[in-house]
Structure formats: C-alpha cells, structure tokens
Curated annotation (Swiss-Prot):
The gene is PAGR1. The modification Phosphoserine is found at residues 143, 148, 237. One of its GO terms (biological process) is DNA repair. Residues 1-109, 128-253 are annotated as: Disordered. It is found in: Nucleus. Residues 116-160 are annotated as: Sufficient for interaction with NCOA1. One of its GO terms (cellular component) is MLL3/4 complex. This is PAXIP1-associated glutamate-rich protein 1. Component of the KMT2 family MLL2/MLL3 complex, at least composed of the histone methyltransferases KMT2D and/or KMT2C, the common complex subunits ASH2L, RBBP5, WDR5 and DPY30, and the complex type-specific subunits PAXIP1/PTIP, PAGR1, NCOA6 and KDM6A; PAXIP1 is required for the association with the MLL2/MLL3 complex. Forms a constitutive complex with PAXIP1/PTIP independently of the MLL2/MLL3 complex. Interacts with NCOA1, ESR1, NR3C1, AR. The keyword DNA damage applies. Its association with the histone methyltransferase MLL2/MLL3 complex is suggesting a role in epigenetic transcriptional activation. However, in association with PAXIP1/PTIP is proposed to function at least in part independently of the MLL2/MLL3 complex. Proposed to be recruited by PAXIP1 to sites of DNA damage where the PAGR1:PAXIP1 complex is required for cell survival in response to DNA damage independently of the MLL2/MLL3 complex. However, its function in DNA damage has been questioned. The modification Phosphothreonine is found at residue 138.
Length: 253
C-alpha cells in the first residue's frame, strides 16, 4: 500500500492538477491495482496516470490560450470607444450667424416696449415688406368634353364649304361648250384682277373640242377661220402666204 501511494504521490507532483473527474478515475484505477497486488503493475499504472495528466494539462493550456486570443485586447476596446464617441451634430443657422460675443440677436428693450404699446393701441401691426408682382395664372387645360363639343362644329363648317371644281373632277354627263370667242379686253377703269380664274373640267373639254374643230376646218379648206373673218372685213387686203404648218400665225383667243 505504501509503494502504491508513493508512486501515486510522484505522479501527482509531476503532472498538472487534474480535474475532479480525473481524480475519481485515478483513485478507482489505484484501487484496482491494489487488488491485483503487484509492485510492477502499480508502477506502470502510475506512469500511465502521469502521462494522461500531462496530456490533459496541455489540452487545458491550449484552450486557455485560444480563449485569451479571442478576447479583445485593451487597446482594441479603447479604439472602439473612441470611434463610438467620434460623432458631431450640425450647427443651426442661429449658431452659425452668432456675433463675436456669442450671444444671439435681440431687439433693444425700447423697441420691444414700443411694439407692445402699438399692439395694445391698434391691435395689429402693419407688415413692412416689399410685395413682389405675381405672374398671371396658368390657363387651365381643356377637358375632353369641351374638345368633343368643338369637333362637331368644325366638321359642320367643313361640310358647309362649297366644293371648288378642278380639272380632275370628271363628269360623264355631256355639257354644252361655252362660246369660244370670249372678249378678253377689259373696260377702262376696271381692275385686271376682277375675276379669279378657275380650272374646270367643262372648260377643258370645250377647249379641246374647239381646237379639234379648227384643225378640221384648216385641213378641209386650207385656211384658218380667223383669216376668213379678216378677208370678209377688208377684201382689199393682200392675201396671206400659205406655209406648210397647220397654224400659219399665232392666234389670240
């Protein structure tokens, strides 16, 4: 018993302090060795207990170092506090416009007394401010109902306008040609722009028929209708020389 206890004391002094569970297990192992009864077995058991205690102590030491590494250092705590305290509040306009003495503007007591007396006497104070001119109001946009009311009126006006005939308005009905010999001479005193000329299909057709009739007359008689009229008016005038063209001279209509 003494030897076992002696070896157990040596192992306890060389190894790191064990936990409570480790002590219980080591005690049970010592009792088991005592029952078997052998000095060599007890010595081996003591050595094994010493090695196990060393391993447990090393493991506990490494865990403590990891915990210490994870814990924030005092310098890091001071920096975090400094960053949290580094804040500012923007100044108001009154603080920016403070005079050199650092006191805000206040009217003199005499002015305050005068204003209170005016309020007591009249009840209101006149506003002393420059009134700027205002621009005219923006016209309101027309609603859809007003637009719909204006559209039928515009359509009615377009329908009421008379149709102006053009040369491309074809009419299949036969029309009587107008007199081909129209006197274009204007009377003195009348303006040259008294009548507006309009292109009409019936006028174009009448001109075509008139030219065709003149060509047939020239081919049949060899003379123009205008030359016959001039010969009847003045028989003593010399005859015109015939040329190879269909229209020997320029005609005026």
């Amino acid at each position: 018993m003494s030897l076992v206890r002696g070896h157990g004391d040596i192992a306890a002094t060389t190894a790191a302090p064990l936990s409570e569970e480790g002590e219980v297990t080591s005690g049970l192992q010592a009792l088991a060795v005592e029952d078997t009864g052998g000095p060599s077995a007890s010595a081996d058991q003591a050595e094994e207990e010493g090695e196990g205690g060393r391993e447990e102590a090393e493991h506990e030491g490494s865990g403590a170092e990891e915990v210490q590494g994870e814990a924030p250092s005092p310098e890091g705590e001071e920096r975090a506090k400094g960053e949290s305290e580094d804040w500012c509040v923007p100044c108001s306009d009154e603080e920016v416009e403070l005079p050199a003495d650092g006191q805000s503007w206040m009217p003199p007591p005499s002015e305050i007394q005068r204003l209170y007396e005016l309020l007591a006497a009249h009840g209101t104070l006149e506003l002393q401010a420059e009134i700027l001119p205002r621009r005219p109001p923006t016209p309101e946009a027309q609603s859809e109902e007003e637009r719909s009311d204006e559209e039928p009126e515009a359509k009615e006006e377009e329908e009421e306008k008379p149709h102006m005939p053009t040369e491309f308005d074809f009419d299949d009905e036969p029309t009587t040609p107008k007199d081909s010999l129209i006197d274009r001479r204007r009377t003195p005193g009348s303006s040259a722009r008294s009548q507006k000329r309009e292109a009409r299909l019936d006028k174009v057709l009448s001109d075509m028929k008139r030219h065709k009739k003149l060509e047939e007359q020239i081919l049949r008689t060899g003379r123009d209708l205008f030359s016959l009229d001039s010969e009847d008016a003045s028989p003593a005038s010399p005859p015109l020389r015939s040329s190879g063209s269909l229209f020997p001279r320029q005609r005026k209509y």
